[in-house]
Amino acid sequence: MLLDGTLIQLLFLLGFMVFMVMLFQRAHIPASIAYLLVGVLLGAHTAGPVISEGYIHKIAEFGIVFLLFTIGLRFSWQQIYQLRHTILGLGTAQVGLTTLLVALLLWAMGVASVVAFVIGAVFAQSSTTIISKQLLEQGEDQSRHGRLGISLSVFQDITAVPFIIVIPVLGVAMAQDIASTLGMALFKAVLATALVVLVGRYLLRHLFHRVSSSDSAELFTLTVLLVCLAAAWLTQSLGLSMAFGAFLAGMVMGETEFKLQVEAAIRPFRDVLLGIFFVSIGMLLDPMLLPEIGHIALAGALLLLLIKIVLVTALVLATGVALETAFRTGLILAVGGEFGFALLALALEGGTLDSRSSQIILTSVLLSMMLAVFLIRYNLQLSRFVVGRWIGQAAVSSEPFDDIEQHGLQQHVVIAGFGRIGQGVAQFLQKEQVPYIGLDLDAARVKNARLADVPVFYADSTDPDTLIAVGLAKARLLVISHEDLSAALTTLRHARTLHPDLPVIVRTRDESHVAELRQAGATEVIPETIEAGMMLTSHVLLMLNVPARRVNQLVQEQRINRYQLLRQQFRGSADLLKTQQQEQLKAVLLAEGSPAIDQSLQMLDLAQYGIQLTELVRAHNRIEQPSLDMVLQENDVLVLFGSAEALEQASLVLTHRLAAD
C-alpha cells in the first residue's frame, strides 16, 4: 500500500525510524541495523505501508556526502602523505586480490566470467559509512587500525569509479575505448583534487575568519553546508561521485583551526541523512525471496567476511604492522560496501546480472553489514581472543595503540575559554611541559595564537562532540575559564556526562555562583575577585613585615575554608542590583527595647533564620565566634552572615520592628 503525499510519507518514515531506533538501543543493537530493517519493512517488496523510493534515494545520497566530509576533516593531507605507500600499496592489493580471488572461486564453480568479475568487484568494496560511523562512536577513528581501516575504505570508494566505468562496457570488446575512458576518469579525479585544494587553501580560511567574526551560529552552519555541497557539485559535474568532492573539501577544512566547530555544525545533518541512507539500502531487499535464497546468501556473506579478514590481515601484516593491529584492520574491512550496491545496479541495468542473482548478492552484502557491525564493535576483544588463543599470547601486540596518546592527547589539560585567564594557565602549563588544548570562539584570538604555534582551536566547548574530539576521555584535567556562566555550566555538565571522574576547575567572576557550580560537578571553583583580594592582602601583610610563612598559612586557610572569610563582606548601595540570594555581612545594633537583650545566643537561635554570627562587638571590643552561653546586652553589635533575605528577616526580629508593625 503506497502512502499518499510526501509529507505523510516523511512523517511515517521518521516516526517508524524513531520507534525502531529506541527499540534497538534498549537491546544495545547499533542504530544502523534498525535503519536497514525499517527500509526492508517499508520497501516495495513487503505487504505493509510503502514509502516511495525515488526521493528517499536522492535524500540518502547526501548522507554519504556529509559523512565523507566529516571523514575528510579528520584526515589531513600530511596524514595521507605519511600513509601514501600503505594506502596505495595495500589498497590496490586488497581491491585487486579480493576481486580476483572471488572471481576465480566463482568461475571454478561454473559461474560465467563476467558475472564472477562483477561479484568480485562488489565484494571488494567496504562500507566507509559503517566503518567510519562505528569507529567514530567508539573513539577509534584515530587509532592505528582505525586510520588504516578508514583510509583503505576511502581508497576503495575511489576505486569504485573505474569499476563503475568498466561494468557497463564489459560486453564491448574494444579495450582501447575502455582504457581511454579510465584515463579520462583519472584525469578528472586529479583535476577535481587540484581545484578543491588550491581554491580551498586560499579562500576557505579567510572566508571562515570573516564568518566566525560575525558571532552568528546560523551563518557559520550555512557556510559549512555551502562549502561541502559546492565541492560535491564540482566533482559531480566532472562525472565523479559527490562524496569524493565532499571528502576533498573536508580534508582542506581539516587543516584549519575551525575543523572542530565545522564538524559540530555538520553532525546533525550527517546523522539524520545517514539514517535515511541505510533505510534506502534496506528498501532494495526482497524478503519474500529469503526462504529460497537465504542459505546461499548466508554462505556468500560468510565467504565475503572470511576472505576479506584473512586477506587484509595478511596484507597489513606484510607491511610490518603488529599482528593484533593487522587482525583488527581485517575485522574492520570485512564489511560489504554501499558502493557495491551501485555496481549491482549497473550490472542489473546492463543485463549482466539477472534479478535473482542480484538479490542473492544484495542479501549477502546486507548480511555482512549486519554481522560486521558487531565485528567492528568488538574488534579488540575478538583480536585478542583469536590471536592469543590460536597463535599464542606472545604474538599479541604489547605496543600502545596509535591513537589519542600518540597525537599528544594523553594526560593533557583541556582549557575551555582561551581569554586572559585561560592563556595565563596555558603559559604556566607550557613552562612545565604539560600538554594542553585550548578552545575558544574568538576567531581573531585563535588566529593570532595559532600563528605562534599555540594548540588552540576555534570550537565551542558547550558542544559535547567538541569535548569528545579533543580527547576529554583521556584528559588529565579540564579548566573552564569562560566569563559567561551559562557556557561554563553547560560545558561542566557535558564534561561530567562524558567523564564523571575528571577533575574540573572552574573560574568565576565572584563568589555569587560558587555553590551552583559546585552542585553542577566542579571539583574546584576559583572566584576571580576573591583571589585578587587574597593576592592584594598578601602583599599588604608582607609590606607590614608579617612573616611570609604566616602569610602563606593565612592564604591556605582561606582556600581550605572555601574563602569563607573573604566572602563575608558588607554590601554597599552599588550592590543593590545583586541577587537577594547572594551571601553578605550585615551589622545589627541591639538598641534599647530589642527583644534580644538579656537573652543568650543559644536561646536566640540565629541558625533558624539561616544566618551565622561571625563576631560580636561590645564596647569597641571585637569578640570572634562568641560562645553560645554569652548573654547579649544593650548596644551590642551583631555581625551576621547570610543571604540578603535571611539577614533582613533576622534584622527585623532583633530590632523589634515586627512587634512595632
UniProtKB/Swiss-Prot annotation:
Pfam families xref list: Na_H_Exchanger, TrkA_C, TrkA_N
Top-level taxon of origin: Bacteria
Keyword Transmembrane helix: yes
Job of this protein: May operate as a K(+)/H(+) antiporter.
Annotated Gene Ontology cellular component terms: plasma membrane
Gene name tied to this protein: kefB
Residues of the RCK C-terminal domain: 571-656
PANTHER family per record: K(+) EFFLUX ANTIPORTER 3, CHLOROPLASTIC (PTHR46157:SF4)
TM helices/strands, residue ranges: 5-25, 31-51, 53-73, 100-120, 154-174, 178-198, 224-244, 273-293, 296-316, 330-350, 360-380
Keywords annotated in UniProt: Antiport, Cell membrane, Ion transport, Membrane, Potassium, Potassium transport, Transmembrane, Transmembrane helix, Transport
Protein name according to UniProt: Putative K(+) efflux antiporter KefB
One GO term of the biological process aspect: proton transmembrane transport
RCK N-terminal domain segment(s): 410-527
Keyword RNA-binding: no
Single Gene Ontology MF annotation: monoatomic cation transmembrane transporter activity
UniProt subcellular location: Cell membrane
Recorded topology in the membrane: Multi-pass membrane protein
InterPro entries: Cation/H_exchanger_TM, Na+/solute_symporter_sf, NAD(P)-bd_dom_sf, RCK_C, RCK_C_sf, RCK_N
Taxonomic classification: Bacteria, Pseudomonadati, Pseudomonadota, Gammaproteobacteria, Alkalimonas
Family per similarity comment: Belongs to the monovalent cation:proton antiporter 2 (CPA2) transporter (TC 2.A.37) family. KEA (TC 2.A.37.1) subfamily.
